[in-house]
Amino acid sequence: RRTDIAEPAPAGAAAWSSNSTESITLRCGVSLPLQYTTLSHTTDAAGSTWLRVVDATPGANLETWYSVNRHPAVAVTTTRAALGSHANPVDDLGESMSDLSTVAVNPHPAPLATLESAGTEDRCDALLSALPNTLGDFTRLDAASVTASGLPAASAAWTAEGQEPVVLRCGVAPAPGYAPGAQLQQVNDIPWFEDTTLANGTTSSTWFALDREAEIAVSMPQSAGNAVIVGISSAISEHLPRA
């Protein structure tokens, strides 16, 4: 049932709840998140197109659905308990959403799409062929989908519903934030550098694999887990020689 919002209530907000653990809130007039990229999965429901973003905070049970083809944009946040057996929290909003303008909003570029190339992509073929089809919960996209996203040659991407993608580029220029003595993380025999200068307001981080004949950059959500970095490290170890 619809409930009151404590004052001062923000403009364009509404809320529904059945108990303390099952609630849904709506905001109209929000900005679309940076997680909305050319690699995003979207869902059509209630006459609109929606982006689902799962809260990756450990222990959190929230997800937010953003309307990406309406103005003003709408965000609906729900607990998973409130969803129950429903696929989404927006199916009943069709009549209300029809009052908003339909617009075409360009998504943000895919992660790493704008990184500078080092011109060493020709050394990456064996690695790209050997990369796994799955990394934890993430499934690799085919080459046509990667190209359609705007990523350049020698790129790979894996996606999972509601999460930011994992993106790999081979043959990029050295990490902008790297300097001798920087802290590195060793995974198997691959030293990785996390470049925090490339943080863009999302939950993803950018990592560079060092000491190979072509430099590798990987963007991945912080919640992706060890399966992603271990799987990629194994492929690099076997299929990309040391510098």
Residue ranges and their predicted role:
Residues 1-56, 134-202:
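Short, solvent-exposed recognition patches
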Residues 33, 81, 129, 136, ...:
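Residue-level marker of positions within ordered structural domains that often coincide
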Residues 114-119, 160, 171, 209:
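Extracellular/luminal segments of secreted precursors and ectodomains of membrane proteins
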